[in-house]
């Protein structure tokens, strides 16, 4: 029997949720994703010490540019060992400023292209705010493909699909966390609210012919991953990838095109904002996620300033 990881790869593109180059080289994912929290972790890895010094020297005290160059340099290194794409995140503090999101996305793409990496190997990650979705819609029309992250609600998924974004990252574990804390219950298998959220989105996209890729993210255990086997892509931490690699049990496909999905519904801005207002979990988790990424971005900036 092959491992659960190898079985999963037969019907789902496996993505590594890390900036750890050694882990990526060992686990051989197709794509990789990073975010400010993962970049902060990467900055503490001894193997990146020389890169930090080089970025410091190149940017001459420009902390904002130093953070961007570090993110792109980490991404460029990862692209040398994976066949697919790297997702690099825009500063979360810009999540409600469409023009600023567009400017930062263009800066990141320019840095990648200056490093000899074509834009078709990069996904720009944006928080799934209304402004982030609108920025993504414009970027897609320019040939810059996007990954909409911090996605917790069906309304966010609907708006992303209508905007024609390349890929969404609906979060599983953080939804699970909220419901577990709110109700005091343990959720297992198909009862998991995070699993149910991604399943509903996947079925809706397939039933309505959307091309947007569904990439489940934020997993707490391999049981959640097993319930979403068959999803277009899953981005998984190295720790859980190792667990899947070590498990020789059977892994059946759960998600498949052809399941019944809800009828298409397009949302305008006021409908989107009302739907978010009515979803306490999504509202809280989106705000919390943006705050956490913003704090880690600030820590990365402090590290760059200290290094300078």
Curated annotation (Swiss-Prot):
Its main location: cytoplasm. It is found in: Cytoplasm. Pathway: Carbohydrate degradation; pentose phosphate pathway; D-glyceraldehyde 3-phosphate and beta-D-fructose 6-phosphate from D-ribose 5-phosphate and D-xylulose 5-phosphate (non-oxidative stage): step 2/3. It is an enzyme of class 2 (transferase). InterPro entries: Aldolase_TIM, TAL/FSA, Transaldolase_1, Transaldolase_AS. Pfam families: TAL_FSA. GO terms for biological process: carbohydrate metabolic process; pentose-phosphate shunt. It catalyses: D-sedoheptulose 7-phosphate + D-glyceraldehyde 3-phosphate = D-erythrose 4-phosphate + beta-D-fructose 6-phosphate. Transaldolase is important for the balance of metabolites in the pentose-phosphate pathway. Homodimer. Belongs to the transaldolase family. Type 1 subfamily. NCBIfam families: PRK12346.1, talAB. This is Transaldolase. It comes from Pseudomonas entomophila (strain L48). The lineage of its organism: Bacteria, Pseudomonadati, Pseudomonadota, Gammaproteobacteria, Pseudomonadales.
